[in-house]
Structures are given as C-alpha cells and as structure tokens.
Amino acid sequence: MNIAFYAPLKPISSPNPSGDRLIGRLLKQALELGGNTVTVASPFRSYEGKGDRGRQIQLQVEGEQEAERVLEQLIKDPPDLWFTYHLYRKAPDWIGPMVCRALKIPYVVSEASFAPSQHQG
C-alpha cells in the first residue's frame, strides 16, 4: 500500500529532537516494516501555540496553498491512504482532508487530541 504521511505538529525531518519527532519517525518505520511504501507528503508545520488569531488564519491560508501543491504532486500517482500523526487544536491538519476529498482516499489519524474546554473556541 502507498501511504502519504504527514505530521502537522512537527515534521519528522525537523533538526530539533523531540518525542513527537521520534514517535513520528517510528510510526513511519512501522508502516514501512508492514510492507507499505510511505512518503512524507509535506514538511509544513501548522503549529501556533500562542492563540494568535491572525497567525492562525495565516497558517490556514498557507496550509491550503500547501494542500494544492501536494495535490498537484500526488494526482499523477495517488497514495492509497493519507496518514496524519498528532494533530490538535494548536496544530490542525489543513492539508490531509483537502487532499483526501480530491483523491477520494481514506484519511487516517493517529494521536489526535481533543480538548472539551476548547469546544466553543
């Protein structure tokens, strides 16, 4: 199976070590050990941790533009599945859902975070 892999919180190619980067790399490796071909779809980082609404809107616009770029690349040889690791309110996935709708492929999420206290914004 061909899998497009994406980590909006922190790209697995980041030069800065962290648990998120390590887990992302290990998930990619586990998918590969399962016989899949895994390609990192984008290094785009959507994290905005300060609650800056202007920056969040800017990241959404940039993420949607990145989704268009990624879609252009994937349309020729689409993956069978999109896999997003660790999205949450401070690091939403602006790319995967758009690409999956366009390509009509499954959208899979690992380690999604939900904060009931943030449900109303």
Locate each region found by the language model.
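Conserved strand-to-helix beginnings and helix N-cap segments that scaffold or border functional pockets
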Residues: P17, D93-W94
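Active-site proximal beta-strand in glycosyltransferases
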Residues: M98-P116
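Short N-terminal targeting/anchoring amphipathic segment
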Residues: L71-A91, I105-S110
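Short glycine-rich, flexible loops that bind phosphorylated cofactors or substrates
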Residues: I12, K90-A91, P116
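N-terminal subdomain of nucleotide-sugar transferases
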Residues: M1-S46, D77, I105
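Hydrophobic/aromatic ligand-binding patch that stacks against planar heteroaromatic rings
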Residues: A30, I95, V99
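Short, intrinsically disordered, charge-balanced linker/junction segments flanking boundaries
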Residues: S117-G121
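Glycine-rich, highly charged phosphate/nucleotide-binding loops
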Residues: G54-L74
